[in-house]
């Protein structure tokens, strides 16, 4: 059984679980929330997400082109979306998007289970760099997602 690392981060969003789920089930929205260091060049997918459905991404991370083929492993409307990778820069990748209805909106939790290739070098990078990379990426993604769902009330509404 492969060993993997886990990264997890949550954010409170001013939206219903149905709204947040609908946004995340469309992989084309990744370009709306990706940090500048991750440029989305191409997205091929079918919407809505269904278990077993595939999507393909071409991204550029720090100037390096990366091809990604993902598959929706689970698609539970308004509850969770789980994607795995058939082709990616990772040896193992499983990303769960969990949506919980809470006072004030939706608590969305991103949980990433991953392992890097390159043997000992990959394990060293994981211990020294990956937490920083994931933290920076998900801070940026969650900030952009909060801004996307921010609902400012006008006077008199």
Residue ranges of predicted features:
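Glycine-rich portal/gate segments that line the openings of hydrophobic small-molecule binding cavities
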Residues: 41-88, 107, 143-157
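Short, surface-exposed coil-to-beta transition loops
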Residues: 6-8, 65-69, 92-95
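Beta-strand/loop substructures that line and gate deep hydrophobic ligand-binding cavities in soluble
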Residues: 85-136, 156-157
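Generic structural detector for well-ordered beta-strands
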Residues: 10-14, 58, 71-73, 98-100, ...
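Hydrophobic ligand-binding cavity/cleft-lining segments
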Residues: 1-51
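Hydrophobic pocket/interface hotspot
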Residues: 20-24, 30, 55, 72, ...
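A non-catalytic, amphipathic alpha-helix used as a structural packing/dimerization or gating element
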Residues: 136-144
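Short strand-connecting beta-turns/loops that link adjacent beta-strands
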Residues: 16, 77-78, 102-105
